[in-house]
Amino acid sequence: MGVGHSLTQHPLLSVEAIARLAERLPEDRVEHNVADLPKVVDPNAVRQRDEPPGEIARNIERNGCWMVLKNIESDADYKRLLDECLDEVAPYVRERDGGMTEREGFIFLSAPGSVTPSHTDPEHNFLLQVRGTKQMNVGRFPDTETEQLALEQALGGGHRNVNWEPADPVTFALQPGDGVYVHPHAPHWVQNGPEVSVSLSITFATPASQKTRRVHAINARLRRLGLSPTPPGRRPRLDRGKVAGFNAMGRVRALKR
């Protein structure tokens, strides 16, 4: 679903502002790689540059990199920006899905021609194009079994990348001021245009998406034990038991801290 926005000139989304934010964020909240990649790639095969994150951001026009700044809401200014955006859609989400939780923001900074390989993300996501152009290719899983195994991997502690191209992709050609809504877990890949790209991703969870994530996480554990777990949605009572188990494990981890 296409959307529009008015953030193209926002001072917090300039390359220099993003570079300064990259220098402030914890090291594990900034990720990058050299982005001359195919649409499907082993995450262990990507290369990185041995430079500070701020310099990678400032030199994005010529270093061939892709960078993501995660959980930008940990910075007060960016949290205000995130909340301003999500507050506009929160009433509709509350009416349709029962509430909006886990508000998070991500900034993507991409060199000309870079590729973000096929992957999935667990959140409801509005991707807003701020600078440059890109093609967002959103598809589907080829079959139910592939979907189950991929999501168990991603939500059970594995990588978000998938080892196949999304089936029947729909391409969204994004210009500054454009955006697209991406449903949780929808497989997609991204081709950047001929200029530096800046994109803001504003994400959230709902009760239903939280439940699905937790069932997949428990299913991943069950599969490692040699079992063949039932996918979310087929047996609601069993799903409720898995969610209760996930929540109980979270409480145990909290007590151990």
Model-derived features: where do they sit?
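A short beta-loop-beta micro-motif enriched in histidine and acidic residues
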Residues: 115-125, 167-168
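Conserved short histidine dyad/triad with adjacent acidic residue
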Residues: 106-120, 138-143
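Short, compositionally biased
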Residues: 151, 193-204
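Transition-metal
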Residues: 1-83, 218-227, 249-257
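A generic "binding-loop/recognition-motif" signal
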Residues: 112, 122, 186, 196
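Conserved double-stranded beta-helix
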Residues: 171-172, 202, 206-257
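Double-stranded beta-helix
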Residues: 129-181, 185-187
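A gly/proline- and charged-residue-enriched helix-loop-helix capping module
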Residues: 74-107
